[in-house]
Amino acid sequence: MRKRQDHRATNAGFIFVNDKCNPRVAVVDLHDFVTKQIVGSELIASEHGATFVTPDTDYVVETSQYPAPLGGAYAPIEQFNEKYRGAMIFWRFDKEKGRIVPEESWAMELPPYMQDLADCGKKVSDGWVFCNSINTERAYGGILEGKPPLESGATQNDMDYLHCIHWRKAEAVAKAGKTTTIAGMRTIPLQTMIDENLLAFAPEPKSPHGVDITPDGSAIVVGGKLDTHATVFSFAKMRALIDQKKFEGKDPYGVPILPFKDSIRGQCEIGLGPLHTQFDNQGFAYTSVFIESKVAKWSLKDMKVVGKIPTHYNIGHLSAAEGDTVSPDGKYLVAMNKWAIDRFADVGPLLPQNFQLIDTSGENMELLYD
């Protein structure tokens, strides 16, 4: 779920909610809390990295999760590498009418990795979007054929790929007609993405999950999930490498790959299972630590953890006051907890998750309310 945004902060006129199972996006008007519109495309079969909005809410971004033949066509799983693909859809949002305009929307074809969460650049990184991926191994299971199960096959590589996409330039390419229409959606082919220098990869530690851009837009924080670090990518470094075409190689589809060490500002040792990150107005980041069931507070400047607070359950997402905008409010954070462990509120067997309100205004985080 994402609110409408502008360059100042958040414009709370609408929220956009994605449906992971049936790839579609809903527009909810916050003036009356009524769902005004639901749109979807048969281009993709599933999604996860939605809904993220560009600054000024020109577009609502929806990213596929599981690769599939685009447009719902059939291809045997043995043709996974050749026929299966991911995609990212840019739904045009008319702010005056409060509606998505499908005929002004477009998409881009991506390699058949499992694209995950995404975030749009802001301020210095405005015009770019960054998307995590897992399963650069392109595993699809096959135990009966002697192949490793999907979960094992998809975690063989030490690095996956952070997708760095120049969406503003891609918009111009789409408007120039360099697209192919698939299932009614204008789509920039993968080869065109490469030829027009719209897409580059930066290696990121194994099976990452959260990707979150700092309030000033200068850095991209990636939660390791199967790595103990939060990796801080420097937008300035990556942009310079892309402009100078300093790549360490290409992926099997020809997408250029940036050198990892030259792309990052550093790494912060967070703990076991770092996922998502939010920010305050004092230069601190807050990362959910899934396996430890804690929230870690750490300094963006020093890249050192300054404190942790335990949560009820295995924490997944977290949300700070305006914590993903250009001007975070600070003071409060909500831990969104997933699975019941140890002590928990008796809210029934179907919904064991709960939220916790945490005060972040002081030197140490303090639990205010379960």
Predicted feature residues:
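Predominantly soluble domains enriched in secretory-pathway, periplasmic, or organellar proteins
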Residues: M1-D370
